């Protein structure tokens, strides 16, 4: 059973692709038509593939596997943080640091440093230092939080990565390919479905489109971890969208 209706997808503007001249021919199977020079995405396939993605992450989460959400573009950053936190998952919504996955040992040491500085900050230890030393540590803390806050509790590589904007997050996707980490990605008409495990053809620029799709995936992860969402949680989730 589909977890989203075609009406919901239409209302969120999921069907609007890029200008036809900017397309990637590999996306042809997911394009319904062209209208006024804009490619229109086949929402039947969007619904089917989003349902497949949700079933996949729900089962994976039920089995204890961990999901990382990735989206650093302005339209996605806030949604990525909100939805990942809601389903108790990891996220990166600022700049992707090269080697975040393939050089995890080094990144993990920076995550450990972030936690140490946060402990020192919360205990008041930094406040007891001379002003210059305290200022240096606070600058370091702010920088680490900016890039690593969404993965500060991540102790190992994620089992699945959910991506918004393939073109922007190429480095991260290549790292996933190298490590054999499955990817789910919102793919606009200028992307390539060949390097993604579960492509979700959709508008990756519109906030409502991103929020609808990422929200559905977060719902599925939540249900996989904790069981069916309570009615109050479902209402809150719908209002957020």
From Swiss-Prot:
GO terms for cellular component: chloroplast; small ribosomal subunit. Keywords: Chloroplast, Plastid, Ribonucleoprotein, Ribosomal protein. PROSITE patterns: RIBOSOMAL_S2_1 (PS00962), RIBOSOMAL_S2_2 (PS00963). GO terms for molecular function: structural constituent of ribosome. One of its GO terms (biological process) is translation. The keyword Oxidoreductase does not apply. It is found in: Plastid, Chloroplast. Disulfide bonds: none annotated. It comes from the Eukaryota. PANTHER family: 30S RIBOSOMAL PROTEIN S2 PROKARYOTIC AND ORGANELLAR, SMALL RIBOSOMAL SUBUNIT PROTEIN US2M. Belongs to the universal ribosomal protein uS2 family. This is Small ribosomal subunit protein uS2c. It comes from Porphyra purpurea (Red seaweed).
């Amino acid at each position: 059973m589909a977890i989203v209706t075609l009406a919901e997808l239409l209302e969120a503007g999921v069907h609007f692709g890029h200008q036809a001249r900017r397309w990637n021919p590999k996306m042809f199977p997911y394009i319904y038509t062209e209208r006024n020079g804009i490619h229109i995405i086949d929402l039947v396939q969007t619904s089917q593939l989003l349902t497949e993605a949700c079933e996949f992450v729900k089962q994976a989460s039920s089995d204890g596997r961990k999901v990382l959400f990735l989206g650093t573009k302005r339209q996605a950053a806030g949604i990525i943080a909100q939805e990942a936190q809601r389903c108790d998952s990891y996220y990166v919504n600022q700049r992707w640091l090269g080697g975040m996955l393939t050089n995890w040992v080094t990144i993990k040491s920076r995550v450990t440093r972030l936690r140490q500085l946060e402990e020192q900050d919360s205990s008041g230890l930094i406040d007891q230092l001379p002003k210059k030393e305290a200022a240096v540590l606070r600058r370091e803390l702010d920088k680490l939080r900016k890039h690593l806050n969404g993965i500060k509790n991540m102790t190992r590589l994620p089992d699945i990565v959910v991506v918004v904007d393939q073109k922007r997050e190429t480095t991260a996707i290549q790292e996933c390919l190298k490590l054999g980490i499955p990817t789910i990605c919102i793919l606009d008409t200028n992307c390539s479905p060949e390097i993604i495990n579960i492509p979700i053809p959709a508008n990756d620029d519109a906030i409502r489109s991103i929020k609808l799709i990422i929200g559905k995936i977060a719902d599925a992860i939540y249900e996989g971890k904790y069981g069916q969402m309570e009615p109050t949680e479902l209402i809150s989730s719908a209002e957020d969208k």
